[in-house]
Amino acid sequence: FAGTPEAAVPTLRALHASSHEVVLVITRPPARRGRGKTLYPSPVAEVAARAGVEVAETTTLKSAQIGERIAAVAADLGVVVAYGGLIPPAVLQMPTHGWVNLHFSDLPRWRGAAPVQWAIREGDATTASCVFHLEEGLDTGDVYSRVEVRIGRESAGELLDAMAQAGASQVLDVVDGLQ
């Protein structure tokens, strides 16, 4: 599993509570926050540590060290939700069935960062959460599941939170179907 912000937590929790084994969590390193500039682990790192899942914190998936850790767990499938970086081709090939990604937009319209904010800013009436087979490139690959979401008066944060909650079961459905 690869993810960093709070939006990735519902999917991590759902996978951990399911019949699927989460063998490694990859996330960004602790970040400084607040007036005291205290280092805080990512929300994903906190949840994984409490669940007893091995955590690898890295700013890049291109290093040999992180590649070795991913290869060592011999995962069947990788799941990505808002990790915050591109996955290099060598790492994409490590899990037996590759990687799936939950993206909070109607692909391919809003590939990349801040898709919910862009959909709202551009006045879209709807968006979608998409689970897709991750390929080399930015948010590219065959879409396995698309769930349309109406954009109302909620803030981008509220809409993202709702999509993150709903997206967790969407990911589980796709992962179950790939077995």
Summary of predicted features, one role per range:
Residues 2-16, 49-53, 74-76, 166-168:
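Hydrophobic N-terminal alpha-helices or hydrophobic patches in metabolic proteins across all domains
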Residues 31-51:
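N-terminal beta-loop-helix "entrance" segment that forms/cooperates
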Residues 1-35:
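N-terminal Rossmann-like dinucleotide-binding module
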Residues 21-25, 54-73, 78, 85-104:
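Internal alpha/beta domain cores that form substrate/cofactor-binding pockets in large enzymes
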Residues 9, 38-41, 63-67, 85, ...:
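Structural motif corresponding to alpha-helix initiation and N-cap regions
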